[in-house]
């Protein structure tokens, strides 16, 4: 069936919260329904399109702005976009949201206590941050501003990835006749 609805799912949270894990699972779930999806992962963007950016507050805001612009282009091309990046600042997320029509920007707060994220530390970044090697690391040397009213709030320390995906899927603006298996 023809896909009618496109939107962006914007996963935000500290490093190690589970954004990439959930983004990949969500993509699999939507792909299985025959929907056209595109995943914008923060690490991939930082190694490509945004490789010229550092980690100053201004550069972090620019990272979010560029990602929102790419997401908008992908939506215009008919894709459901899944963006997974820390995006630590409320004002920058708000500006990203403003690029999209009402109801097409679904903010997902991937919430985890900092100590849990540090214990997970899949990339070894928290250790480096605590040693001073990454002075502006989000959650340690730079603030992460929790979303005030995200469309979806999942807590990955208490909830399994599959339960988180089920919660996210319930909030997506999917047409009932789109991509039905």
Swiss-Prot record:
Enzyme class, spelled out: transferase
Pathway stated in the Swiss-Prot or TrEMBL entry: Sulfur metabolism; hydrogen sulfide biosynthesis; sulfite from sulfate: step 2/3
UniProt xrefs under InterPro entries: APS_kinase (IPR002891), P-loop_NTPase (IPR027417)
Active site: 87
UniProt entry keywords in alphabetical sequence: ATP-binding, Kinase, Nucleotide-binding, Phosphoprotein, Transferase
GO MF assignments: adenylylsulfate kinase activity; ATP binding
Binding, ATP: 13-20
Reaction(s) catalysed by this chain's protein: adenosine 5'-phosphosulfate + ATP = 3'-phosphoadenylyl sulfate + ADP + H(+)
Alphabetized Gene3D superfamilies for the sequence: P-loop containing nucleotide triphosphate hydrolases
EC numbers, comma separated: 2.7.1.25
Family annotation (SUPFAM superfamilies): P-loop containing nucleoside triphosphate hydrolases (SSF52540)
GO biological process: hydrogen sulfide biosynthetic process; sulfate assimilation
UniProt keyword annotation of Transferase present: yes
UniProt xrefs under CDD domains: APSK
Claim: Hydrolase is one of the keywords in the record: no
Described function: Catalyzes the synthesis of activated sulfate.
Family recorded in the similarity comment: Belongs to the APS kinase family.
Protein name per Swiss-Prot or TrEMBL: Adenylyl-sulfate kinase
Source organism of the structure: Burkholderia ambifaria (strain ATCC BAA-244 / DSM 16087 / CCUG 44356 / LMG 19182 / AMMD)
Gene name, Swiss-Prot/TrEMBL: cysC
């Amino acid at each position: 069936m023809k896909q009618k609805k496109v939107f962006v799912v914007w996963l935000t949270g500290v490093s190690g919260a589970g954004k990439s894990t959930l983004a990949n699972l969500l993509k699999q779930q939507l792909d299985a329904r025959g929907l056209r999806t595109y995943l914008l992962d923060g690490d991939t963007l930082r190694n490509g399109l945004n490789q010229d950016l550092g980690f100053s507050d201004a550069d972090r805001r620019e990272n979010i702005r560029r990602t929102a612009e790419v997401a908008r282009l992908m939506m215009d091309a008919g894709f459901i976009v899944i963006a997974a990046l820390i995006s630590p600042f409320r004002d920058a997320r708000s500006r990203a949201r403003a690029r999209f029509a009402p109801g097409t920007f679904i903010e997902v707060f991937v919430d985890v206590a900092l100590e849990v994220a540090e214990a997970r530390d899949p990339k070894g970044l928290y250790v480096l941050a605590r040693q001073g090697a990454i002075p502006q690391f989000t959650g340690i040397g730079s603030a992460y501003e929790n979303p005030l009213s995200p469309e979806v709030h999942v807590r990955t320390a208490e909830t399994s990835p599959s339960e988180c995906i089920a919660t996210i899927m319930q909030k997506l603006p999917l047409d009932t006749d789109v991509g039905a298996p």
